[in-house]
């Protein structure tokens, strides 16, 4: 009988929402698992766990990534931003406030991923037309169907 041994932990030194983090992570541990289970950032949601719904979207060095498909070890030396890193105390980030004003959330489950993707869209200057916004945001699913309101919130900030 052959015994399998677990691979040695991998050192992870990163910044999460501007705070330095030093952890030993398993080589198979996803960024989503580390954020939610080890660091307590539960705003990042686990939806499909297959990269199809966008609920787990976070920013790594300003680029959107699906944290359920990203190994935590890949984030060594990088800046990770979650939905919790946007507000300043009780003051919402302007995009968060626009989502509220435009009623761009219903159940709210997809909202953190929607907002993180929208931030990347805006940073990349991809908010040309409403069709372009919808295309960029197509990787983020909303079961409640708040898509027109999501586009309106993004459009407000883009202008």
Regions inferred by a protein language model and the residue ranges of each:
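Signature of N-terminal electron-transfer/Fe-S-associated modules in redox systems
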Residues: 1-159
């Amino acid at each position: 009988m052959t015994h399998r041994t677990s691979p040695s932990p991998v050192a992870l030194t990163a910044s999460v929402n501007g705070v330095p983090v030093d952890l030993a992570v398993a080589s198979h541990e996803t960024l989503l698992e580390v954020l939610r289970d080890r660091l307590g950032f539960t705003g990042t949601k686990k939806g499909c766990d297959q990269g199809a719904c966008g609920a787990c979207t976070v920013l790594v060095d300003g680029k959107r990534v699906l944290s359920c498909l990203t190994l935590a070890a890949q984030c060594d030396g990088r800046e990770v931003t979650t939905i919790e890193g946007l507000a300043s105390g009780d003051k919402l980030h302007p995009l968060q406030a626009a989502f509220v004003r435009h009623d761009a959330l219903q159940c709210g489950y997809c909202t953190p991923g929607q907002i993180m993707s929208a931030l990347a869209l805006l940073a990349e200057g991809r908010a040309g037309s409403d069709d372009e916004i919808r295309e960029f945001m197509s990787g983020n699913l909303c079961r409640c169907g708040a898509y027109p309101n999501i586009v309106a919130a993004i459009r407000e900030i883009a202008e």
